[in-house]
Amino acid sequence: MCGIIGINSNKEVTSTILNSLRKLEYRGYDSAGIATLNSGYIQEVKCEGRVDNLEKNIIKNKLLGNLGIGHVRWATHGIPSTLNAHPHSSDNVSVVHNGIIENSTLLKKFLVKKGHRFKSVSYTHLTLPTSRS
């Protein structure tokens, strides 16, 4: 289970996403994360634990942006960790996900043969290589 929020605005969205994640925290408190688009670059801050921990990291990393996604996670696959926390990002895309990718083992084997490397055991990480053009 998890909680997901996304916002696109002409104003800074980080604090709004953070406040929304606080309201969604009952859906997952094992890890939390936010990714924003700022000046054409994806910035990502994640942590193990509750949204309060995430807020400290956001302040430390000065996360800003007018487009962003956030996620709180209840770990059902993979241990609670910063590495397994969402969002998962590449250079040009950031993804959050709720649920199970049924053919994840087969998909991962296929992508590893193609040379892809994975940082986490989260199902969501499998979608990043396939989203690149």
Where are the model-predicted features located?
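Conserved small/polar residues in nucleotide/adenosyl-binding loops
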Residues: 124-130
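Conserved glycine-bearing catalytic or ligand-binding loops at nucleotide- and phosphate-handling centers
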Residues: 116-122
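Ser/Thr-glycine-rich phosphate-binding loops at phosphate-binding pockets of nucleotides
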Residues: 72, 123-124
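N-terminal glutamine amidotransferase
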Residues: 1-105, 109-113
